[in-house]
C-alpha cells in the first residue's frame, strides 16, 4: 500500500518467512481503511439528511449498529470467562450489528436446534471499527499467511489466547505496545464440530467444503491443545455462523 514510511527497511522482508507477516499486516490495513471509508460515507449521508431537514440519524444508526453498556449480570459473566485475565477488565459494551445478527439468526433457524457458544476473538485496536461495522469476514489473505487450519474465522475458548492478538503491550502474537486493548465475545453456531489435535493434512486453503469431507454436516473445526497447539482454537468457515 503506497504511503509515507519513516523507515522503509522495517517494511522489507529479510527472510522468506517475513513475506506472510508483511502481507497479513498490509491486508489488515486495507480492512481498516475499508471500514473507515464506509464510515465516512455514512457520516456524509447523515449530514445531508440533517441539512435537508429529514429525520436525523446517528452515526451508529447509519452503520447499522446498536451499542449499549453491558449489564451487571453480563459483566459478571464476562469476568468469569476472562479467567486468569479478569483483573485486566475495564469496561464492556454490548454491540449488535443488525446485518450480521440477522444473518446469524437466519442460519440458526435453518439449522434448527444447535448449540451456540460464546468465544473470544482478539484483534489490534485499529481493526475494531471495521470489525463492528463489517463483521468478521473470511479473509483471502489466509491463503498466503497459511493459518494452521485454513481459510476460517478463528476463535478461542480461553481469553488469554485471544489476548495475544490484541494491541496490549507485550501481546504474544502481534507485539502490542498499548496500555489498552479490546477483545470481543462472539456468539457462534458451534453445533456439530470436527475434532482434531493436529494440522496434518489440513492445508492453508482448507475451507468449508474440505470440512464437510472430513465430517459431513460439521459446523466448525475444534482444534485441541496438544502436539501443535498450546490452547484450543475453534474455526468457522462461514460468516453467517458468527454473530
Residues of each region from the PLM?
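Intrinsically disordered, low-complexity terminal and linker regions
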Residues: 1-127, 226-243
